[in-house]
Regions:
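Conserved class I S-adenosyl-L-methionine
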Residues: 40-50
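Conserved SAM-binding loop of SAM-dependent methyltransferases across substrates and taxa
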Residues: 51-63
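Residue-level signature of catalytic and energy-coupling elements of molecular machines
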Residues: 28, 48, 117
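Class I SAM-dependent methyltransferase Rossmann-like catalytic core
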Residues: 1-40
Length: 124
């Protein structure tokens, strides 16, 4: 039987090999593969987005037609961020709905709202 450390190392190595920022990407991939939460063209809010791996997965799933807004207390660095990604450094619990929705930019169609809200954080 493998140890917890070996399992952790497996997912860490997989994340590195596939170019994800962290192994947490596989958690969202697993959830979305089973539940089909994120669709092409969706507008996604990732609350507590650091280090950014859920944003990476969400961007792949929404395609160019969709948009992803990530907010976190920590700065999330992104080299050559796509135009359909907006990263906000701030407190999700203090952010106004308007400031989050502004992140949708030109992807604001129909009712101005998010189709999916993701979070892998603990708020306290």
């Amino acid at each position: 039987m493998s140890s917890d450390r070996e399992v952790w190392d497996h997912w860490y190595r997989q994340a590195q090999a596939q170019g994800y920022r962290s192994r947490a990407a596989f958690k969202l991939i697993d959830i979305d593969d089973k539940r089909k939460v994120i669709r092409k063209g969706d507008r996604v809010l990732d609350a507590g987005c650091a280090p950014g791996s859920w944003c990476e997965v969400a961007l792949q799933r929404v395609g160019l037609e969709g948009a992803v807004v990530g907010i976190d207390l920590q700065t999330v660095e992104w080299r050559e961020a796509p135009t359909n990604l907006r990263l906000i450094e701030g407190d999700f619990l203090q952010a106004s709905a308007e400031s989050l929705l502004e992140g949708l930019g030109s992807h604001r169609r129909g009712p101005t709202r998010f189709d999916v809200v993701l979070s892998d954080m603990m708020a306290f």
